[in-house]
Regions:
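A residue-level signal for beta-strand positions that form part of recognition/binding surfaces
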Residues: 137, 172, 252
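ATP-dependent adenylation/nucleotidyltransferase module used to activate substrates
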Residues: 1-160, 218, 233-249, 257-270
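A sequence-level detector of short, solvent-exposed, charge-rich linear segments
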Residues: 132-136, 177, 194, 198, ...
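Mid-to-C-terminal catalytic subdomains of enzymes
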Residues: 145-210, 257
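A short interface-forming secondary-structure element
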Residues: 215-234
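A short, flexible beta-alpha/helix-coil linker loop
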Residues: 84, 180-182, 225-227
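Conserved active-site loop/cleft motifs that coordinate metal ions or position small ligands
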Residues: 210-212, 219-221, 253-256
Length: 270
């Protein structure tokens, strides 16, 4: 069974280690579930959790991690990986995620000699994930991948662990993923994207949206609720918020159905 496989994988990974692993927890359901599973496995010890903060991390993700750390008695390290000062990251190339994860894992390795775990899952292997290359270089382990567990099983496991509605938490990559490839990533831009998405969620509770900063427009994409349910009155309110936050005019704002990875643009050479 998946749960037993995961337990065996973790036991093998920590065998003969002098320290418990540090789990890199972004605030998404994958890394949260891994951390809760491991904390249940080592109930008599505080597990080590690292959470990176910065302009690319939504504030709600950080708040979520802090609450869970208190609930499950994690030894939480809030770290600033400072990738926003890395010119390679700022340039926003197609492999931007590599530089983000490189900064993350180097920061974690600076304060622990123990193993580092990530919440990457089996489904991630079918997508372009340069962050996995950075993980490999830093000798980071991925228990879910080793146990052959994908997102669907993770959600089931989260439910079994008593995480309730969190088991249905929508996927939400970092805010930098909203910026079209090649457009420089800045603190101000990421803060505005976060502010815009939070404003929409205030108008539409539980909305699953992406505000993508594209070369020629701001693309507001709806996964939930569906775009055809957004009436003109609501669009007008959202447009007004966008004009105020980004200092743009309404002709550069579009409403679209969510499309995964639509801000990621491969170069013509590729």
């Amino acid at each position: 069974m998946p749960q037993q496989n995961l337990k065996k994988v973790i036991e093998i990974l920590i065998n003969n280690q002098s320290e418990l692993p540090t789990i890199a927890v972004s605030g998404g359901i994958d890394s949260i579930t891994l951390a809760v599973f491991i904390s249940n496995q080592f109930k008599k010890q505080k597990i080590n959790v690292a959470h990176a903060i910065g302009p690319a991390v939504p504030k709600e993700a950080t708040n979520r991690v802090k609450k869970l750390a208190n609930k499950f008695n994690w030894d939480l390290n809030i770290i600033n990986t400072n990738e926003i000062s890395d010119p390679r990251y700022i340039a926003n190339p197609i492999n931007r995620c590599f530089f983000c994860k490189e900064n993350l894992y180097l920061t974690i390795k600076s304060y622990t000699k123990g193993p580092i775990f990530s919440g990457a899952n089996l489904d991630d292997l079918s997508d372009y994930r340069p962050g996995l290359d950075a993980a490999r270089e830093a000798n980071v382990s991925h228990p879910f991948i080793l146990a052959k567990i994908g997102k669907k099983i993770i959600r089931q496991l989260a439910s079994n662990l008593g995480l309730g509605k969190l088991s249905e938490l929508p996927s939400s990559p970092c805010l930098a993923s909203r910026v079209q490839t090649g457009i420089p990533v800045t603190t101000n831009l990421l803060n505005n994207i976060d502010k815009m998405e939070r404003s929409i969620k205030e108008l539409i509770p539980n909305a699953d949206i992406r505000c993508r900063w594209m070369l020629n427009n701001l693309s507001i994409q709806f996964n939930y609720p569906k775009i055809d349910t957004i009436n003109s009155k609501l669009k007008k309110k959202i447009t007004s918020k966008a004009i105020d936050i980004f200092s743009i005019n309404d002709s550069t704002i579009e409403f679209k159905e969510y499309k995964k990875g639509s801000a990621f643009i491969l170069s013509k050479e590729n």
